[in-house]
Curated annotation (Swiss-Prot):
This is Large ribosomal subunit protein eL34. Belongs to the eukaryotic ribosomal protein eL34 family. The gene is RPL34. The keyword Lipoprotein does not apply. PANTHER family: 60S RIBOSOMAL PROTEIN L34 (PTHR10759). Pfam families: Ribosomal_L34e. One of its GO terms (cellular component) is ribosome. Signal peptide: none annotated. One of its GO terms (biological process) is translation. One of its GO terms (molecular function) is structural constituent of ribosome. Keywords: Ribonucleoprotein, Ribosomal protein. The lineage of its organism: Eukaryota, Sar, Alveolata, Ciliophora, Intramacronucleata.
Length: 123
């Protein structure tokens, strides 16, 4: 008859956190080896992007406290939050909106100078 294995921890139910794999030891015994949960990779937080972030460690949330800061972030604006394409598009969008504001200011100030020139030419 096959050898039976028992749980090593207190929880005796087949839950998601209590998954077990059968492993044969060098001594020939079958023992229960606990399997860690599958880790979800860190994704870009921009709406509709959901790209995996490169350079960020894929660990369980509790393990983030123990790993180095260099494994948790990327040395860039929004590093560890947004992917590089989303950061690039945000920078370009911000630049273009600033350009539009400058152009609007120039367009508003131009007619005033034209009126002054016309008045000085009439005199």
């Amino acid at each position: 008859m096959a050898q039976r294995i028992t749980y090593r921890r207190r929880c005796s139910y087949n839950t998601r956190s209590n998954k077990v794999r059968k492993v044969k030891t060098p001594g020939g015994r079958l023992v229960a080896q606990y399997v860690k949960k599958v880790v979800n990779y860190t994704k870009c937080s921009e709406a509709g992007c959901n790209v995996a972030l490169n350079g960020i460690a894929q660990v369980r949330p509790a393990e983030y406290a123990t790993i180095a800061r260099s494994a948790k972030t990327v040395s860039r604006v929004y590093g560890g939050e947004l992917c590089h394409t989303c950061v690039r598009s945000r920078i370009i969008r911000a630049f273009l909106t600033e350009e539009v504001k400058i152009v609007k200011r120039k367009m508003i100030s131009k007619p005033k100078t034209d009126k002054k020139k016309k008045r000085s030419q009439k005199k």
